[in-house]
């Protein structure tokens, strides 16, 4: 096909660029996220919804091996602070009514967790779908010492900057928290 202003040399250079072979490489994603959440728990066969909202903040560092233009996988170091974690173990009043729940603030070590997860990612031109499964290695209490699963969508906003929207489950069935954040990809190509 011929167009105005192009010659055969331009066509040959374009053909060479299209046929460049993909070379696998490692990229590094750093993600900072946060969200608000509600919390409920069961005690003596009765369900309680804790009044108010609680903050969740996290940081992920994920080296990813890029197997092809469309798939990458790696391990992620995941740190998360959850203000509502393990509250059921720190009830201040005896046999409270649902609107009168009072709590002692749990120690930081019961609300903070660090884990490692295996991640895989399907890469598309504008966004990527990220799936992961992991285990908290540092964390005390039922809410922070568990297996967790991550499903996230990464939408590119610049060459190496992306928005991160995800959800985390724990113990393969229980909803944990929303993950709204921003990320940066080092060594992205």
Predicted segment positions?
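Repeated loop/turn-to-beta-strand initiation elements of outer-membrane beta-barrel proteins
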Residues: 70-73, 124-130, 155-165, 188-189
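Membrane-embedded beta-strand positions of outer-membrane beta-barrel proteins
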Residues: 28-32, 75-77, 116-120, 131, ...
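Surface-exposed strand-loop-strand hairpins of Gram-negative outer-membrane beta-barrel proteins
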Residues: 35-60
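Transmembrane beta-barrel domains of outer membrane proteins
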Residues: 62-64, 119-123, 154-156, 183-185
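Transmembrane beta-strands of outer-membrane beta-barrel pores
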Residues: 32-38, 79-83, 124-126, 133-139, ...
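Residues that define the transmembrane beta-barrel architecture of outer-membrane proteins
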Residues: 24-26, 53-59, 110-114, 145-149, ...
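Flexible, solvent-exposed loop segments that connect beta-strands
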Residues: 41-50, 84-108
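Outer-membrane beta-barrel "beta-signal"
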Residues: 1-10, 175-189
């Amino acid at each position: 096909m011929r167009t105005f202003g192009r010659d055969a040399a331009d066509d040959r250079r374009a053909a060479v660029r299209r046929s460049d072979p993909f070379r696998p490489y490692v990229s590094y994603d750093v993600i900072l996220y946060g969200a608000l959440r509600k919390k409920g728990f069961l005690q003596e066969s009765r369900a309680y919804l804790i009044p108010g909202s609680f903050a969740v903040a996290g940081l992920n560092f994920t080296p990813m091996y890029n197997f092809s233009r469309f798939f990458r996988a790696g391990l992620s170091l995941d740190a998360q602070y959850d203000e509502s974690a393990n509250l059921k173990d720190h009830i201040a009043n005896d046999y409270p009514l649902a609107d009168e729940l009072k709590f002692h603030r749990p120690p930081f070590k019961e609300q903070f967790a660090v884990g490692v997860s295996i991640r895989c990612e399907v890469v598309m031109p504008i966004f990527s779908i990220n799936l992961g499964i992991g285990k908290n290695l540092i964390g005390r209490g039922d809410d922070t010492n568990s297996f967790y699963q991550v499903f996230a969508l990464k939408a590119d906003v610049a060459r190496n900057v992306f928005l991160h929207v995800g959800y985390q489950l724990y113990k393969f069935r229980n909803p944990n928290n929303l993950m709204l954040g921003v990320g940066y990809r080092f060594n992205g190509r």
